[in-house]
Each structure stands twice: as structure tokens, then as C-alpha cells.
């Protein structure tokens, strides 16, 4: 029986479509009718072959603000021994000296030491590869800087341990109140200590105990922040109560309202500023509606801080 198939004895049969039809050949045009190209080349006709430029350092231009300049001292390839400070002037910072420095000072000193260490490491590497040895002056300076850096870490570790121990100690409310009362009576209310020194101590105290930063924008309003402004408000009243009758009158009872506390908290640490704050507090007490409820303390103080930040930014913009 015959079967239909794509194959036959003569070979495969291919289906023809309109796409498989051979295209008719185009007639060959005479040369005079061929259109010349509209563009002869994609390159500029003004290019000329010049001599190659040898790669030298004079052909390189490095910007003055390039970060790798931090690995050079005054843009010198390598310093001589005369460029280094004399050995009699080289000594590391001692731990007692570093204990008097603030965190920002220690931070800056650390990175200055790190930058100088990078410069010395590069120069020592060059000396080993070019000269084959190192100079004692470079090694002595590097060791001194290294000693300063580990002593900075020692001081920071001391502060971290002291901070952790104090946080654990202040978790006990009775011990916390006893500590604050002792500190206030012995230092903050001591008339033998000048007001400017007490103000400087209070700046560090409020940050360590209550987390209140001197920079307004860095503060987070929480329960500890509320307790801090109330404590500082009453402390200012007790400090300057003998300088003015109005301050003495307001200080008869502790300040408990957060609105009144915020007025005293934002006042300067001087009798005249505290007196002006007491005048504002007396005006607030004329209406009982001005008292801030306990449940509204956090949102109210957040609103006060936003207004204070806005006023400060406007003042800086117009200055």
C-alpha cells in the first residue's frame, strides 16, 4: 500500500512558499548611474600622526584634594631624618594627660596618630626596598605614636567601664536619689564654687545621668529626659534663691509641672535669667489650665523642643 511521505526515491521534497522563491536578479547599472557615497570617512580629516608621548611623571596631574595625599607628609615623596622632630621632643601622650581630654579630642588625636602612622609605614616600606634598612628616627617616632594610640584605647576603656558601672548602680532608685542629693549639696549648691564652673559640671552631669545633650537636636524625649529637666529646674531655684525674693518664693515648693520645669531648664545658669523664668512661671500659674497633665508630659515636651529648634534655626538663618 502506498504511503504518503516527504521522501521519495529521487530525494527529499521541500515545500515551496513565497519566501523560498528565488528573488529575481537586479540588472547591473552602468558606472555613470551609481551614486557615490555621501561620506568618505567617519573620522576627522584634520587628524595627523604625531610622535608618541613617553609616559613620565611630568605628564600626570594629581589634584590637591586627592585622598592619597594623606599618605604623604607635605606632599614629599619621603622625608629625611632632619624633617622629623628631634628625638628629645618625641614622647607619647601619658594616660593622666589623656584622661583630661574629651571624647571629641581623643577622637581627633586618634585619627591624627593614625594618619601619621600611615605616612611612616609608607616611608619605612620605601626605605626597606630602596636602602635596604630603616632609620632609627622613623622607628622611634612610630613606636611613640603607637604607644599614644593604645593609651587612648586604655582611657576610653576606663570610661566605658565607669559608665557601665554607674548605669548599673543608678538602677536602684534609692541609691540614685541619695547620689543626686549628695552631688547637689556638695557641688552644685556649694557657694564656694563659681557659677561658671557649676554650669560646666552640669553640662557633663545632665548628659551622663539623664542623657540630655547641650545640642538641642541631639535629644530624645523620654521619661529620663523629663526627670532630668525637673531636677535641673529645682536645682537652679535652690542655687539662686538667695539672690532674689521672687526666686525664693517660687523655690518654697518643688517644681513638678513639666511646663514650668522646661522654662527653667532653657534659662541660662545665672540669677537674672532664672528671675525672668520665675516671672514667666508666675504668669502661668494665674490660670489652672496651663498645668500640663502627667499623661501629656512627653508629647508636650516634644512640641516644646520642636518649637525651640525651629526658633534656633530661624535665628541662625537671619544672623
From Swiss-Prot:
Region of interest called Disordered, as start-end residue ranges on this chain: 1-55
Where does it reside?
Mitochondrion
GO annotation (BP), single: mitochondrial translation
Spans through the membrane = none
Q: Where is the transit peptide?
A: 1-14
The protein's GO terms of the molecular function aspect are: structural constituent of ribosome
Keyword line: Mitochondrion, Ribonucleoprotein, Ribosomal protein, Transit peptide
Spell out the Gene3D superfamilies in the cross-references.
6.10.140.1190, 6.10.330.20
List compositional bias (Basic residues) regions by residue number. Answer: 15-24
Q: Which PANTHER family match?
A: LARGE RIBOSOMAL SUBUNIT PROTEIN UL29M (PTHR21183:SF18), RIBOSOMAL PROTEIN L47, MITOCHONDRIAL-RELATED (PTHR21183)
| Protein family membership | Belongs to the universal ribosomal protein uL29 family.
Question: Subunit details for this protein?
Answer: Component of the mitochondrial large ribosomal subunit (mt-LSU). Mature yeast 74S mitochondrial ribosomes consist of a small (37S) and a large (54S) subunit. The 37S small subunit contains a 15S ribosomal RNA (15S mt-rRNA) and 34 different proteins. The 54S large subunit contains a 21S rRNA (21S mt-rRNA) and 46 different proteins.
Q: In the UniProt entry for this protein, what further remark is given in the free-text comments?
A: Present with 7700 molecules/cell in log phase SD medium.
Q: Any idea what this protein is called?
A: Large ribosomal subunit protein uL29m
Amino acid at each position: 500500500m502506498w504511503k504518503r511521505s516527504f521522501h521519495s526515491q529521487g530525494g527529499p521534497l521541500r515545500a515551496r512558499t513565497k519566501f523560498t522563491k528565488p528573488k529575481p536578479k537586479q540588472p547591473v547599472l552602468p558606472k555613470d548611474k551609481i551614486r557615490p557615497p555621501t561620506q568618505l570617512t567617519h573620522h576627522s580629516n584634520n587628524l595627523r600622526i604625531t610622535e608618541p608621548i613617553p609616559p613620565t611623571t611630568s605628564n600626570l596631574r594629581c589634584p590637591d584634594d586627592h585622598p592619597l595625599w594623606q599618605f604623604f607628609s607635605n606632599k614629599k615623596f619621603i622625608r629625611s631624618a632632619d624633617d622629623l622632630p628631634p628625638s628629645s621632643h618625641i614622647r607619647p601622650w601619658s594616660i593622666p594627660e589623656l584622661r583630661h581630654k574629651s571624647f571629641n579630642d581623643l577622637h581627633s588625636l586618634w585619627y591624627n596618630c593614625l594618619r601619621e602612622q600611615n605616612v611612616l609605614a609608607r616611608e619605612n616600606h620605601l626605605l626597606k626596598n630602596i636602602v635596604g634598612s630603616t632609620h632609627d628616627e622613623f622607628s622611634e617616632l612610630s613606636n611613640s605614636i603607637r604607644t599614644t594610640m593604645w593609651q587612648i584605647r586604655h582611657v576610653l576603656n576606663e570610661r566605658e567601664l565607669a559608665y557601665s558601672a554607674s548605669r548599673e548602680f543608678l538602677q536602684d532608685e534609692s541609691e540614685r536619689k541619695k547620689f543626686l542629693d549628695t552631688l547637689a549639696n556638695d557641688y552644685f549648691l556649694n557657694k564656694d564654687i563659681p557659677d561658671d564652673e557649676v554650669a560646666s559640671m552640669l553640662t557633663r552631669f545632665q548628659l551622663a545621668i539623664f542623657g540630655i545633650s547641650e545640642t538641642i537636636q541631639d535629644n530624645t524625649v523620654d521619661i529620663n529626659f523629663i526627670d532630668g529637666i525637673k531636677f535641673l529646674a529645682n536645682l537652679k531655684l535652690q542655687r539662686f534663691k538667695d539672690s532674689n525674693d521672687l526666686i525664693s518664693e517660687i523655690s518654697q515648693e518643688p517644681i513638678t509641672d513639666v511646663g514650668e520645669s522646661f522654662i527653667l531648664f532653657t534659662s541660662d545658669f545665672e540669677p537674672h535669667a532664672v528671675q525672668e523664668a520665675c516671672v514667666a512661671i508666675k504668669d502661668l500659674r494665674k490660670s489652672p489650665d496651663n498645668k500640663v497633665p502627667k499623661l501629656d508630659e512627653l508629647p508636650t515636651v516634644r512640641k516644646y523642643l520642636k518649637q525651640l529648634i525651629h526658633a534656633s534655626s530661624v535665628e541662625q538663618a537671619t544672623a
